[in-house]
Design a protein with these regions (language model features):
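A conserved beta-strand element that flanks and buttresses the S-adenosyl-L-methionine
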Residues: 159
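Hydrophobic adenine-recognition pocket in adenosine-nucleotide-binding enzymes
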Residues: 163
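Class I (Rossmann-like) S-adenosyl-L-methionine-dependent methyltransferase catalytic domain
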Residues: 5-155, 167-267
Length: 267
């Protein structure tokens, strides 16, 4: 690539070389945008949530070269969580770790090689779980389940990273209700920093994306979380995405104070 740039520079000059580079970058991202929009049009016609996420996985919907789970699962984007997760495991004496959705297990091996835990990774996409099972060991297992409605495995900590911002309000509360009847002590959740009210929470169809603020309506979590850290995304200029650790009793209290009912998915 560098050799090609030098050839272009010698034959075209600096101005034309820069213009050509910008044009290639623009065309690349325009093509990605076109492909995404075409997939999106078909995706939200699918009524089954499981089939929707199957489609996202099978088509590489997020169009990322390193991870089919999207840029948030790249090693670069997971630098901070790979630093903080071992600290949480040690501080809170975590022995059983439940990771859902686990995605394509791209970054988690970097954590597991340095901690002593029993790990269960889970996702709604069966083909993804089948692929992940090549990584199974005595202390590493994978199971297919729907975190909204299926029984969650007993564990000390559940990681639910980069998930709720893809869920409708109804499905978020379904999951939280399901979490409350589980035998899980702590949960690590993604939320976006919104100190200056840069955005308002909005409802979506599950499988889509929007930023989410768990400390604003309709969730209204209290800011008495146990632990937090910046969960950097390589495409964010500012560090808006954070992860927050809560106990199950905290989640229960939030939901008791702010009961919400959504009759159907979406709006």
């Amino acid at each position: 690539m560098i050799k090609r740039l030098l050839i272009n520079f010698r034959s075209l000059g600096l101005k034309k070389t820069v213009k050509k580079i910008i044009s290639k970058i623009f065309n690349f991202f325009s093509l990605k945008h076109y492909k995404r929009k075409k997939l999106e049009k078909d995706l939200f016609k699918i009524k089954s949530i499981e089939e929707r996420f199957n489609k996202i996985y099978s088509t590489n919907y997020w169009l990322d070269g390193e991870s089919r789970s999207g840029t948030g699962s790249n090693l670069k984007s997971t630098e901070n969580i790979r630093i903080h997760l071992p600290k949480i495991i040690e501080r809170f004496h975590i022995k059983r770790l439940f990771d859902a959705p686990c995605g394509d297990f791209n970054w988690m091996p970097q954590v597991l090689k340095n901690v002593n835990v029993d790990y269960i990774g889970s996702d709604i996409v069966e083909d993804l779980i089948i692929s992940n099972r090549k990584n199974e060991k005595n202390n590493i297992k994978f199971v297919k389940l729907d975190i909204r409605i299926d029984k969650l495995p007993a564990s000390d900590l559940m990681i639910c990273r980069d998930c709720l911002f893809h869920f409708s309000y109804e499905d978020i509360f379904k999951f939280l209700d399901n979490f409350l009847i589980s035998d899980i002590k702590y949960i690590l959740l993604t939320s976006h920093l919104n100190t200056e009210n840069q955005f308002e929470n909005r409802n979506i169809v599950t499988g889509d994306f929007r930023k989410i603020d768990l400390f604003s309506k309709p969730f209204n979590f209290e800011k008495n979380y146990i632990y937090s850290f910046v969960d950097r995304d390589i495409f964010e200029i500012q560090n808006f995405k954070h992860m927050y650790l809560f106990s199950k009793s905290q989640i229960k209290n939030y939901l008791i104070k702010n009961p919400q009912k959504f009759l159907s998915e979406g709006f």
